[in-house]
Amino acid sequence: MPISSTLNQRVRARLEDDDFGHVSDESVSNEALDEGESNEDTEQDNSDQRETDDDDTEDDGHTEISDINPSLNTISFGALAKAQAALGKRKRRTTSTTDITPKRTKVLSRQSPTPSTSSNKEHDQGQGLSEFQKHLASNAKKPPQKLTHRTSKHAPTIQSSRHAVSRKRTILEPLAVPKPRDPRFDSVVLSHSTNGDPSTAANADIHARNNYAFLNHYRTDEIAELRKQVSALQTKKKKTERDDHEIVRLKREITSMSDRQRAFERKEMEREVLVQHRRREKELIREGKKSQPYFLKKGEVKREVIAKRFTEMSGKEKQRALERRRKKVAGKERKEMPWGRRGVE
């Protein structure tokens, strides 16, 4: 055995301090040679040693004890310490190379089995580790991405690309729901009623408005008649519950008809503002003061309509309009205030 041979070579008569350094150097060199030879032969003799170790354990046990027992009395403590240190290093190297590598190969064979050869064993192990790490990184759970909300209600909605598409198909389209329409104000009917004149067909809405302008006069007369009925019911001496309900209904009808009348008047004023602006732009282009016309925006048209209405109002109407405007602005500001400050003026 190599342990007994090394110990027998070192056993000598007790040396002096000067000669002890020389002997220790020789022992270290012998240990290094033995380690080199053992490391070179481990790969070739692993299979043979595994078979013969079990058979020779009993025979070698008696011989080792007989060889070591008489020599232990003459070995110095320094030599034993060096031998123990050398054996400890050898054990660490063997465990690091023999115990860890099969575990790594087992893990790699489970996760990503790849064929390996004896010549490129270390290279395959390093490559397997990197592939194993990549596999773990790819299979790691990614945090779910939260869909951000829309910046405004007019912005398009955000939807994941993984959203499943519906498997249902519309084989038969549903029937179109019939919508009622008034033929008096339909552009198709009005275009046919102009006797094929293209100028009048293009301005069918204007002609319809002019043809049915008497309806607005009827509406004003109806509002006046409803107000008379409300005043008659209010001045009635003995009013019943039915009369109260009738007054509420008539007032609601008056407000709806008056709102409709005001909306019609506002549209007429907007149309007049646009017509006047187009005339001015045409005159400026005809005079050569402009090369391209300027088209009013909706906000500009609205401001001009308000200014025109304000100039046409009387003194009392202006005060009422300003008071309504003031209350409207005050209500908006009160809504923006905190709840505790709303009641404080």
UniProtKB/Swiss-Prot annotation:
Keyword hit for rRNA processing: yes
Basic residues: bias regions: 143-153
UniProt keywords, alphabetically: Coiled coil, Nucleus, Ribonucleoprotein, Ribosome biogenesis, rRNA processing
Principal location class: nucleus
Acidic residues bias (residue ranges): 32-59
Region (Disordered): 1-167, 312-345
Location of the protein in the cell: Nucleus, Nucleolus
Similarity section: Belongs to the RRP36 family.
Its biological purpose: Component of the 90S pre-ribosome involved in the maturation of rRNAs. Required for early cleavages of the pre-RNAs in the 40S ribosomal subunit maturation pathway.
Protein name in the entry: rRNA biogenesis protein RRP36
Source organism of this protein record: Ajellomyces capsulatus (strain H143)
Gene expressing this chain: RRP36
